[in-house]
C-alpha cells in the first residue's frame, strides 16, 4: 500500500509507469484502497443482498461483514494498484493483448502487482473433451465466486474473471 497523500490517478500512473513501458504499451490496472482519505470504491449497503440469501443467512452475513462492505483490500488510508491487462499497439495501430504469462512477466519487470491469479487451467486441443472441460471451468468459477476471499478475507469477494487465451481468439 502506498501513502494516501494528495494524489490523482494521473500521478499514480506516472509514478508506476513513466519511463518503464515499451513504445506502444498500454497498461490497464485497478486502483484499490483509499485515495485522498476516501475509499476508492464507495461502501456497499449489504441490505441489498438480503433477498438473495438463504433464510437466516443474512444475520450471519451481517455479523461477519457488517451493514456496509468497505472494499479496502487490506489498505489503511493508502492504496494499491493491480494490473489486469497489457496491450501493445504497433505502428499500424494494430492492438495485441499480451498473454497472461506476458502480463505477469512485465509486471515483475516494471515492479508492480498483477491481479491475484486463483487458478490456471489448460484445456486439451481434443475437441471431444471441450464440453466437460467447459463445465469444469464453470464449476471452478462458481466455486471461486461463492467461497471466501483468501487474498482479502476482511471483505466480500467482488467476483472473479475468467481469461481465455488461444490462437483463434483474443484473450478476454
Which positions does each model-derived feature cover?
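Core nucleotide-handling region used for phosphoryl-transfer chemistry
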Residues: 1-172
